[in-house]
């Protein structure tokens, strides 16, 4: 078993067992850490052969859009977040319906509407109006917000507006001990250690007036989609996979097989009841809870966020109905609360966190009262989450019942066409406060959920298309890195790097299409001596200019560069020590350039959508641009490795552990040049 507290040695020992129990997060982070170590003996994982994933839909679908990230601190200031938060508080939200087109978003079009910004709650967009753009320009004393140098300001003001208008305390996050903690939208649990990316977390910290932590720099990252697809074989189990059958097959190549229940299901799933207003709905729910409580039947009430659970709790307290609340604020008490949820007279209010897979035992005499009663206060975007709530009752053949209570003011109904449902209300002339159970409305709710599920699947699929590009590059880098880590002699690789650097410099300056007398010898000298520290300037002989033989020129410069490197090697008595230095410097250079490349690819991804305006596929454009950037990165790794090795200074015989220190000395020397 691997725990969060397990040491490196304990992890290695556990992974070497035939069967290892580990959480998906620990496993993923161990993989990333293995690809950051400098010495082979620090590795913990074996090859990825076979995995069995518990609650497989939670891991491979719900968490598919959240990458695992190992990060370090960046040097970016946090002041801009505070300034944008101050400005966002002064800005007025427009009264428009917020239906901003995707084309407007891509073009960053200034929408002519009232107010300073518009919000599209369906797609979670915020957009400045013409008034808003002017307000930002005046506040920051800039002429044009759309200028490239002002992109950071534009990005941060949008983040601040999103934080205030789309991210809600006690729903999307909680504030605890002056820290903003993410609430998992699917489980309702706090996600310690996780942070919203792209500066959104900092914008929320500024909004909540807690310390704004510096933006982090990504050192290594991978999505669960790509990580688990690296296993030779994979399988999983869950009670709610059938609605996502297509995604399991398309993304993971996994078939979904429904296994019959151990005992027949006796739970009765009632049709939804729908009310006109949220107030009417909550009053009806409280009445139903009170009725069940009076006869002793236990009730589990599922809410979709903390606010809703606390509002319902307040109403029950006024009716003097004893109950327990289980949400992200009280998650420490989860096991105790869930254990008692099936007892006589128990009333439990829970966000989506009422323990996936938790077996709620029925107390004595409860089966005769009808078993555990499930009440859903709102439909979730995903039918799976609703099914999980229903599945808390009627386990192992126990009796039970479930029912959802909805209102036209619920988010799902409000954002996906409550006008159509309202027309049904008006046609049937339903009196105020009275519920309706109608097939048309139930079908509408299911269609809305299917539509959202389809949208979310498309988003995850699109994410995977982009991430495949990153994944191919990551696999190449990690494979090369492992070669170095395995102790392979890198000397020949280093010598080839020197030759390639010389060759690239000569090709850039001495083109066969240009007359030899026009070759810029000063530029050639600058480029080559920036890499190889020749004492004398690099010049061309009259004969080389006359013959214009680029191949011969490269050969001369290569030979001189290799002679200089051989002299550098003689400064270190032990050849094995030099091989170790080459290995460590190459590893550290790969790591540094790779982390910069991750940031560059992220920036490319942010702006790639604009290319679709030219009738070009943004994913294809991303692949081509990413390929060019990857080639630039490999050239930069080669160049910096050679620079460092030529300039390394060894003042005494060093042991293996001191190699990284030597590398730092070399790096400092280089930065001072």
Stretches with model-predicted labels:
Residues 173-181, 187-195, 396-397, 404, ...:
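Extended, charged helical/alpha-beta scaffold domains that provide interaction surfaces
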Residues 1-407, 412, 417-424:
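Conserved P-loop NTPase motor core
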Residues 316, 670-673:
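Generic leucine side-chain signal with a strong bias for well-ordered alpha-helical environments
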């Amino acid at each position: 078993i691997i725990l969060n507290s397990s040491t490196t040695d304990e992890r290695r020992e556990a992974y070497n067992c035939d069967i290892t129990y580990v959480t998906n997060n620990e496993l993923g982070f161990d993989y990333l850490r293995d690809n950051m170590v400098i010495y082979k003996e620090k590795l913990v994982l074996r090859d990825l052969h076979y995995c069995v994933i518990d609650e497989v839909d939670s891991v491979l679908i719900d968490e598919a859009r959240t990458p695992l990230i190992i990060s370090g601190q960046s040097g970016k200031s946090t002041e801009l977040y505070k300034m944008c938060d101050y400005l966002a508080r002064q800005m007025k939200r427009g009264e428009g319906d917020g239906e901003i087109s995707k084309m407007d978003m891509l073009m960053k079009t200034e929408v002519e509407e009232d107010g300073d910004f518009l919000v599209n709650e369906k797609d979670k967009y915020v957009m400045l109006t013409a008034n808003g753009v002017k307000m930002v320009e005046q506040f920051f004393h800039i002429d044009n917000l759309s200028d490239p140098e002002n992109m950071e300001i534009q990005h941060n003001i949008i983040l601040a507006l999103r934080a205030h208008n789309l991210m809600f305390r006690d729903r999307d996050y909680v504030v605890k001990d002056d820290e903003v903690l993410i609430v998992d939208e699917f489980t309702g649990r706090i996600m310690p250690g996780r942070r919203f990316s792209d500066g959104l977390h900092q914008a929320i910290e500024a909004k909540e007036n807690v310390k704004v932590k510096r933006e982090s720099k990504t050192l290594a990252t991978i999505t669960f989609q790509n990580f688990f697809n690296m296993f030779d074989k994979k399988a999983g189990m869950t009670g709610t996979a059938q609605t996502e059958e297509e995604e399991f097959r398309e993304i993971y190549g996994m078939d979904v097989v429904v296994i019959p229940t151990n005992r027949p299901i006796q739970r009765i799933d009632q049709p939804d009841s729908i009310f006109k207003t949220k107030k009417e709905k909550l009053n009806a729910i409280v009445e139903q809870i009170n009725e069940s409580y009076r006869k002793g039947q236990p009730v589990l009430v599922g809410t979709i966020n903390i606010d809703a659970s606390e509002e319902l709790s307040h109403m029950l307290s006024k009716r003097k109905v004893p109950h327990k609340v289980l949400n992200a604020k009280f998650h420490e008490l989860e096991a105790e609360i869930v254990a008692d949820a099936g007892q006589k007279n128990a009333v439990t209010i829970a966000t989506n966190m009422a323990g996936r897979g938790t077996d709620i035992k029925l107390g004595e005499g409860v089966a005769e009262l009808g078993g555990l009663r499930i009440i859903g206060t709102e439909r979730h975007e995903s039918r799976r989450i609703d099914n999980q709530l229903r599945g808390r009752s009627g386990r192992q053949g126990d009796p039970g019942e479930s029912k959802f209570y909805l209102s036209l003011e619920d988010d799902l109904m409000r954002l996906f066409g409550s006008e159509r449902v309202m027309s049904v209300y008006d046609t049937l002339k339903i009196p105020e406060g009275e519920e309706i159970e109608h097939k048309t409305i139930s079908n509408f709710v299911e269609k809305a959920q299917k539509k959202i599920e389809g949208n979310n699947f498309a988003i995850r699929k699109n994410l995977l298309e982009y991430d495949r590009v990153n994944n191919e590059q990551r696999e190449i880098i990690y494979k090369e890195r492992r070669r170095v880590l395995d102790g392979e002699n890198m000397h020949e690789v280093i010598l080839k790097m020197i030759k390639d650097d010389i060759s690239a410099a000569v090709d850039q300056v001495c083109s066969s299409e240009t007359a030899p007398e026009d070759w810029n010898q000063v530029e050639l000298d600058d480029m080559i001596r920036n890499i190889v520290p020749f004492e004398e300037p690099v010049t061309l002989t009259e004969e080389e200019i006359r013959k214009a033989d680029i191949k011969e020129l490269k050969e001369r410069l290569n030979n001189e560069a290799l002679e200089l490197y051989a002299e550098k090697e003689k400064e270190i008595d032990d050849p094995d020590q030099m091989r170790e230095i080459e290995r460590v410097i190459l590893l550290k250079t790969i790591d540094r350039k790779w982390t910069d490349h991750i940031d560059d690819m992220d920036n490319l991804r942010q702006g790639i959508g604009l290319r679709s305006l030219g009738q070009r596929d943004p994913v294809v454009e991303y692949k081509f641009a990413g390929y060019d950037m990857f080639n630039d990165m490999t050239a930069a790794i080669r160049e910096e490795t050679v620079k460092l090795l030529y300039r390394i200074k060894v003042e005494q015989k060093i042991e293996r552990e001191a190699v990284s220190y030597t590398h730092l000395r070399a790096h400092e020397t280089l930065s001072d040049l």
